[in-house]
A protein has these predicted regions:
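Domain-scale recognition of functional cores that engage charged ligands
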Residues: 71, 144-146, 177-178, 190
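ATP-binding N-terminal substructure of ATP-dependent carboxylate-amine bond-forming enzymes
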Residues: 1-90, 119-124
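Short acidic-hydrophobic, aromatic-tinged amphipathic segments that line or gate anion-handling sites
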Residues: 114-120, 148-151
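Glycine-/Pro-rich loop/turn segments that contact NAD(P) or position catalytic residues
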Residues: 79, 91-110, 123
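Conserved anion/nucleotide-ligand pocket segment
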Residues: 133-155
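Conserved ATP-binding module of the ATP-grasp superfamily
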Residues: 111-113, 153-201, 232
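Solvent-exposed alpha-helices and their adjacent loops that cap or buttress functional pockets
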Residues: 127-129, 139-142, 186-189, 199-202, ...
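ATP-dependent carboxylate/phosphate-activation module, predominantly the ATP-grasp catalytic core
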Residues: 154, 191, 198-236
Length: 236
C-alpha cells in the first residue's frame, strides 16, 4: 500500500483482511508536517527503483488510494515488478487535466467544453483564446487548489502571479508527476500549467468505475457537493 491514508490503515487492519493478507506500507503524508518536507528532495523514479529492489518476488500486488502520488507510482511499480496494474501512461492521461480533455474531445466531442492550456513558468502574457468568463485550474492539483471562475485577464494574471516561495512549492508538488510523465508518455505540456475551460452549468457528478480486460464496469453515479459559495468539494 503506497502513501496510505488513515482510513487505509484502519480498514486493512480489520480481521477479514489480516486473516488472509499481509500489507506493507510505504510513502509519506503529503499534507502533514514533517512528512511533507520530504517533497523537497523526493525523486519519484528513484523511489520506484528502490521499492522494486526491496519488494521484487515478495509481494502479489501494489495498491494506493492516494490520487496525487500513489496511483501513478503504484502503476509504475506494478509494471516494474510484472504485477497486475494500470498502465502508467493511462494514469497520466487521466490525471493530467489538459490531456484528459484532449482524449475526451476526440471520443465525445459533443460533451467536452472548449479548453486551452496556459503554461505558467514564464508568466501569462496573453488572454486565452476562448475568452472570458472561463474556469481556470491547474492541470495537476488536488483539493481544488487554485481553481477559480475568472472574469477578466486581470483576474487571470493575479491568479497566476506566484511568489518565489509559491513557485517553489508548486514545482515540488508536481515534479514527481512530471518526471514520470516524461518517462512513460510523449506529452510535452508538463504539470506546471493551468487549463482554461469554457463555463459549464448544471449538476456536477462523478462517474465511478473501472476497466478490466477491456470491459467497462460502472460502479455508480456520485453527486459532488461543494462548500457553499466556493469551488471546493465538501463531500461526495
Amino acid at each position: 500500500m503506497l502513501f496510505p491514508k488513515d482510513w487505509d490503515r484502519v480498514e486493512l487492519d480489520h480481521p477479514r483482511y489480516r486473516a488472509g493478507y499481509r500489507f506493507y506500507y510505504e510513502g509519506f503524508d503529503l499534507f502533514r508536517f514533517p512528512d511533507n518536507a520530504r517533497l523537497l528532495s523526493f525523486d519519484a523514479r528513484r523511489y520506484v527503483d528502490r521499492l522494486a529492489r526491496k519488494y521484487r518476488g515478495r509481494i502479489d500486488g501494489v495498491i494506493s488510494n492516494n490520487e496525487h502520488f500513489g496511483a501513478l507510482i503504484a502503476a509504475a511499480l506494478a509494471q516494474r515488478l510484472g504485477l497486475p496494474g494500470a498502465d502508467p501512461a493511462v494514469i497520466i492521461a487521466a490525471q493530467h487535466k489538459y490531456y484528459a480533455r484532449c482524449l475526451q474531445s476526440r471520443i465525445v466531442p459533443g460533451a467536452t467544453p472548449r479548453f486551452e492550456a496556459l503554461p505558467y513558468d514564464d508568466g501569462i502574457t496573453a488572454p486565452p483564446q476562448l475568452g472570458f468568463p472561463c474556469f481556470v485550474k491547474p492541470v495537476k492539483a488536488t483539493y481544488s487548489v487554485l481553481a477559480r471562475h475568472v472574469e477578466s485577464f486581470a483576474q487571470l494574471r493575479a491568479l497566476m502571479d506566484f511568489s518565489p516561495l509559491e513557485g517553489l512549492i508548486l514545482r515540488k508538488l508536481v515534479q514527481p508527476f512530471d518526471d514520470l510523465m516524461r518517462l512513460y508518455t510523449p506529452f510535452t505540456i508538463g504539470a506546471r500549467a493551468m487549463i482554461a475551460e469554457e463555463i459549464l452549468d448544471g449538476v456536477q457528478v462523478n462517474i465511478d468505475g473501472y476497466v478490466h480486460n477491456g470491459v467497462i464496469n460502472v460502479l455508480g453515479v456520485v453527486d459532488e457537493v461543494m462548500y457553499p459559495g466556493t469551488q471546493a468539494f465538501m463531500r461526495f
